[in-house]
Amino acid sequence: MAIYGIGTDIVQLSRIAAVLERTGGRFAEKVLGPDELRVFHARRARSEARGIAFLATRFSAKEAFSKAIGLGMHWPMTWRALQTLNQRSGEPYVVASGELADWLAARGITARVTVSDERDYAVSFVVAETDAPPPAPAPVPRTLP
């Protein structure tokens, strides 16, 4: 496997809370996939702070993933096309759907994700890998003294 790209993102939890309040909850529905949305509602019902932290880590993971694959938030990378779920062990993993899944499969891209949150911030890091041979590196221009 070769590294296709890496991405990282950090978001302030208060920013996510403010957007969620301003949109009456629609922000979560816009950003989260169906499985993520179920977890968000369950966590938020138990603790508003844990719900906000979950939403922030998932938002951050999508941003980091979009950077790792080199597209930013442009088709086929859409908010709901990528979900970050958790194994029983707690390990996060990404699941792509629709046209994003097709785009990734055509390029042999898989990804690993890690997320974390603390009192004020959520952070994510994504490593996208491919089984395709990496392109030759661009020559480095030499400068004369």
UniProtKB/Swiss-Prot annotation:
User: What protein name does the entry list?
Assistant: Holo-[acyl-carrier-protein] synthase
Binding-site residues, Mg(2+): D9, E63
Enzymatic class: transferase
Q: Which domain of life is it from?
A: Bacteria
Q: Which GO terms describe its biological process?
A: fatty acid biosynthetic process
Entry keyword set: Cytoplasm, Fatty acid biosynthesis, Fatty acid metabolism, Lipid biosynthesis, Lipid metabolism, Magnesium, Metal-binding, Transferase
Role noted for this protein: Transfers the 4'-phosphopantetheine moiety from coenzyme A to a Ser of acyl-carrier-protein.
Q: What are the TM regions of this chain, as residue ranges? A: none
Q: Which GO terms describe its cellular component?
A: cytoplasm
Q: Which InterPro entries match?
A: 4-PPantetheinyl_Trfase_dom (IPR008278), 4-PPantetheinyl_Trfase_dom_sf (IPR037143), ACPS (IPR002582), Ppantetheine-prot_Trfase_dom (IPR004568)
Cofactor(s) for this UniProt protein: Mg(2+)
Identify the stretch annotated as signal peptide in this record. none
SUPFAM superfamilies in the cross-refs: 4'-phosphopantetheinyl transferase (SSF56214)
| A Pfam family matched in the record | ACPS
Substrates-to-products reaction catalysed: apo-[ACP] + CoA = holo-[ACP] + adenosine 3',5'-bisphosphate + H(+)
Name its species. Answer: Burkholderia vietnamiensis (strain G4 / LMG 22486)
Question: Molecular function (GO) terms listed?
Answer: holo-[acyl-carrier-protein] synthase activity; magnesium ion binding
Member of which family? Belongs to the P-Pant transferase superfamily. AcpS family.
